[in-house]
Design a protein with these regions (language model features):
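Asp-based, Mg2+/Mn2+-dependent phosphohydrolase catalytic module
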Residues: 1-9, 90, 106-107, 111-201
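Active-site neighborhood of HAD-like aspartate-dependent phosphohydrolases
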Residues: 2-46, 171-172
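Generic structural signal for small/hydrophobic residues in well-ordered secondary structure
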Residues: 12-15, 54, 101, 126, ...
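Acidic donor-diphosphate engagement hotspot in glycosyltransferases and nucleotidyltransferases
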Residues: 20-21, 84, 105
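Helical cap/lid subdomains and adjacent loops of hydrolase enzymes that gate the active-site channel
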Residues: 28-37, 47-50, 72-83
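A metal-dependent, Asp-based hydrolase signature
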Residues: 45-73
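Short, acidic loop-to-helix structural element flanking the phosphoryl-transfer center
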Residues: 72-100, 139
Length: 201
């Protein structure tokens, strides 16, 4: 089967670039519990969603969730990159792909993390839900990242660890891969899939 020719590759942040796919359940809620937060998990998830849509600042989020004592830099220390992601990004950049990230995230945290790990050296285009008030899988989010990449959906590959987001991308005409599935759960496996199925335009 001939390889598909693409111009852009768009990666999700949590669960693809970063190791933890459920950052709320795996990182945020435990962090807040350690700070004495008494809210239910459901209430924390609601506050996070509001913050990820740009309706709350992180200062407002921390006050609502647990009062003084929690802050952005402290929380973001718990995140780590997926093993092998930087070498793969460097290879994709060198191959001439236009790289972007489409993520449902809090703006301040997204900025802190990409600066901490030096991701903008490889991924210059970011659509963060809090910055635009739009979360995946809404079609407008995908339209925004394609616009930033200056290419049409049919020339873009989208990689995400959530099935609903992958399906939404496909409905818009994008190529899409569901990361985290058997045979596609490491950067080496993603590299191999990219080599077998895609080539730069």
């Amino acid at each position: 089967m001939p390889r598909a020719r693409i111009e852009g590759i768009v990666l999700d942040a949590m669960g693809v670039l970063y190791a933890h796919g459920d950052d709320v359940g795996e990182l945020l809620i435990p962090y807040l519990r350690g700070k004495g937060c008494k809210l239910s998990d459901r209430d924390i998830e609601h506050l996070y969603r509001e913050c990820s849509l740009g309706r709350l600042t992180t200062d407002e989020f921390w006050i609502e969730a647990c009062g003084p004592g929690a802050y952005d830099e402290d929380y973001c220390r718990s995140h780590r990159l997926t093993d092998g992601v930087i070498p793969l990004l460097a290879e994709l950049k060198a191959a001439g792909y236009r790289l972007g990230c489409l993520t449902n995230d809090v703006g301040e945290w997204s900025t802190l993390l990409r600066e901490r790990f030096g991701l903008t050296e490889y991924v210059p285009h970011w659509v963060v839900s809090a910055d635009y008030g739009i979360r995946k899988p809404r079609p407008e989010a995908y339209d925004l990242i394609c616009s930033l990449l200056a290419t049409e959906p049919g020339r873009v590959l989208f990689v995400d660890d959530r099935a609903a987001n992958v399906e939404a991308a496909r409905k818009l005409g994008m190529y899409a891969l569901h990361f985290g599935q058997p045979g596609l759960s490491t950067m080496d496996e993603l590299r191999q899939t990219l080599h077998e199925r895609f080539t730069p335009w």
